[in-house]
């Protein structure tokens, strides 16, 4: 576990500042895009293709009509998740890393993508 955390921290440092170009169709969501960038989401996720994690449009498609989607995705962001998409685990982002309000913004942003 310690080795994994060290590797994750090293990756975060190495990729600091990496941000994919925002697709023009999401221009109205620039603030949410920037929040995702500042939070480090783009190290594993992006739009239009899978990276280490699933493309966000795929997440939106899977959960869009699920009445529990916001709660489910919020729980994954807080506690992390594994096995739902690919073989890699997603680390959790507790409140000390990502505020309740910012988690809500990110979940709504992800679910709004088409």
Residues covered by each model-derived region:
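Bacterial N-terminal signal peptides that target proteins for export
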Residues: 1-7
